[in-house]
């Protein structure tokens, strides 16, 4: 069984990291798929985001980090992954993620989506919120892993 955890991760937050660590305990392995989203201009380019994630996950040897573009369901098909992992912070996340899960299922009936609720310590976090705090010099060390914190401070100085 291969599990795919897709996202833009611009940047990776401690909420993402917590979800990855918990999923690794449950499933034993995981593929973190970093989306190259051509409709958005990311703060960090794809290569930098992958480096940040790999450096943040160095303590988890069973985690693979890849990049992809296009549909997540196509990425899952290419990897022969039959499970897509998504995190839920609030009810609004559930409504959005359920719609995506149903769309993926309509494109490939063998794909299942598994939802893990976010640890309450991180339920307020989003990548855009972290960038906003970093932009104005706020403390972010409790929001992101050290490799990401370093890059954000450098980016916004």
Swiss-Prot record:
Give, as in the UniProt entry, the pathway in which the protein acts.
Cofactor biosynthesis; coenzyme A biosynthesis; CoA from (R)-pantothenate: step 4/5
- Binding annotation for substrate: 8, 40, 72, 86
Presence of keyword Nucleotide-binding: yes
What Gene Ontology biological process does one annotation of this record name?
coenzyme A biosynthetic process
InterPro entries xref list = Cyt_trans-like, PPAT, Rossmann-like_a/b/a_fold
Quote the catalytic activity from the record.
Answer: (R)-4'-phosphopantetheine + ATP + H(+) = 3'-dephospho-CoA + diphosphate
* Alphabetized PANTHER family for the sequence: PHOSPHOPANTETHEINE ADENYLYLTRANSFERASE
Q: How does it assemble?
A: Homohexamer.
Q: What family does the database annotate?
A: Belongs to the bacterial CoaD family.
Name assigned to this protein: Phosphopantetheine adenylyltransferase
Q: Which organism is it from?
A: Prochlorococcus marinus (strain AS9601)
Name of the gene: coaD
């Amino acid at each position: 069984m291969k599990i795919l955890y897709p996202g833009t991760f611009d940047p990776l937050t401690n909420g993402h990291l917590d979800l990855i660590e918990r999923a690794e305990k449950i499933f034993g392995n995981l593929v973190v798929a970093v989306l190259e989203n051509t409709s958005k201009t990311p703060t960090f380019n794809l290569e930098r985001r992958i480096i940040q994630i790999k450096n943040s996950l160095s303590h988890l040897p069973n985690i693979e980090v890849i990049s992809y573009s296009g549909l997540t369901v196509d990425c899952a098909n290419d990897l022969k992954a039959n499970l897509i992992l998504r995190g839920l912070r609030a009810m609004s996340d559930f409504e959005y993620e359920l719609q995506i899960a149903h769309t993926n299922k309509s494109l490939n009936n063998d794909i299942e989506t598994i939802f893990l609720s976010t640890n309450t310590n991180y339920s307020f976090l989003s990548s855009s919120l972290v960038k906003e705090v970093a932009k104005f010099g706020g403390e972010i060390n409790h929001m992101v892993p050290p490799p990401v914190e370093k890059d954000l401070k450098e980016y916004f100085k």
